[in-house]
Regions:
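Small/aliphatic-rich secondary-structure junction motif
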Residues: 2-56
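General small-molecule cofactor/ligand-binding pocket signal
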Residues: 43, 91-95, 144
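Structural beta-alpha unit
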Residues: 1-7, 80-115, 122
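Glycine-rich, Arg-bearing micro-motifs that act as flexible, cationic patches
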Residues: 114-138
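A short acidic, glycine-rich active-site loop
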Residues: 60-73
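Short secondary-structure boundary segments
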Residues: 44, 118-120, 147
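Short, hinge-like loop/turn segments at secondary-structure boundaries
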Residues: 57-61, 109-111, 133-134
Length: 147
């Protein structure tokens, strides 16, 4: 997906959810974006099951908006602490639904040249596969998994 006449990725997308590994992934992606002169797209997906009551869904969506705003503020604070020449150009995006499918949609929509994501620490993901593993298996973008 690299365009002719460019020296590296134009857009690096990082999936974040507030876990330690996702914050490390965002920091890693920010460093890559800064060094490559790329735009960094930070994406938070509020997961929720399809089979929930409307009242529970609205509560989950409200909680997700709060989490997204907290993450955006955390990223703004981290960027502000960096010296001017060490900041990457970045934008923050939010979505709702299945994290894997939503991240794939964002990566396609944003024309991401690379995806960075934190490794899952959940035991069940070793059996059914984490979002990171599913992104790697999709084979559409170079994926970096940060521990």
């Amino acid at each position: 997906m690299f365009e002719l006449g460019t020296d590296g990725p134009l857009v690096i997308m990082a999936g974040i959810d507030g876990t330690e590994s996702s914050v490390r992934a965002a920091a890693y992606a920010a460093g890559l974006a800064r060094r490559q002169g790329s735009k960094l797209a930070l994406v938070y997906i509020q997961p929720y099951p399809a089979s929930v009551s409307p009242s529970a869904a609205s509560e989950m969506i409200a909680a997700g908006r709060t989490t997204a705003e907290d993450l955006r503020q955390q990223m703004e604070d981290a960027a502000a602490r960096l010296p001017e020449g060490h900041r990457a150009r970045w934008e923050f995006y939010t979505g709702e639904g299945d994290p894997f499918h939503s991240l794939c949609e964002f990566a396609t929509k944003l024309r991401a040249d690379a995806v960075v994501i934190g490794a899952s620490q959940k035991a069940g993901h070793r059996i059914v596969g984490s979002v990171a593993i599913r992104l790697v298996k999709a084979g559409k973008w170079p994926v970096t998994v940060v521990p």
